[in-house]
Amino acid sequence: MSEFKNVTLIKKANVYYDGKVTSRTVIFADGTKKTLGIMMPGEYTFDTAAAEVMEMLGGSMEVLLPGAETWQSFHEGQSFEVPANSQFSLKIKEVADYCCSYLK
């Protein structure tokens, strides 16, 4: 899906790591949420409350998923899931464009 229709967009950005990771929240009519964002090169760790699906829209990232011992590479067109109430780490070597879907 390259565009979303009939949604509410929160204007205020979600800003992390001194602006190196930013996103905007999109709310759908059924109440589900996604964020569309950009990550600049760096290393980041995030905690989850809800389960998430991270879809790569551009660039790439190395991901250390919860419980994993090895890093995995994800590129444009690929996605990965992160369980609720967990933590995952990212290594970004080039600008990464992503869509994060929050699962209920």
Swiss-Prot record:
Matching Pfam families: Ppnp (PF06865)
Gene Ontology cellular-component annotations: cytosol
Catalytic reaction annotation: a purine D-ribonucleoside + phosphate = a purine nucleobase + alpha-D-ribose 1-phosphate; adenosine + phosphate = alpha-D-ribose 1-phosphate + adenine; cytidine + phosphate = cytosine + alpha-D-ribose 1-phosphate; guanosine + phosphate = alpha-D-ribose 1-phosphate + guanine
EC number, as in UniProt: 2.4.2.1, 2.4.2.2
Record GO terms (molecular function): guanosine phosphorylase activity; purine-nucleoside phosphorylase activity; thymidine phosphorylase activity; uridine phosphorylase activity
DNA-binding keyword on record: no
Top-level taxonomic group: Bacteria
Keywords from the named record: Glycosyltransferase, Transferase
Task of the protein: Catalyzes the phosphorolysis of diverse nucleosides, yielding D-ribose 1-phosphate and the respective free bases. Can use uridine, adenosine, guanosine, cytidine, thymidine, inosine and xanthosine as substrates. Also catalyzes the reverse reactions.
Similarity comment text for this entry: Belongs to the nucleoside phosphorylase PpnP family.
Protein name: Pyrimidine/purine nucleoside phosphorylase
Organism from which the protein derives: Syntrophotalea carbinolica (strain DSM 2380 / NBRC 103641 / GraBd1)
Lineage: Bacteria, Pseudomonadati, Thermodesulfobacteriota, Desulfuromonadia, Desulfuromonadales
Encoding gene per record: ppnP
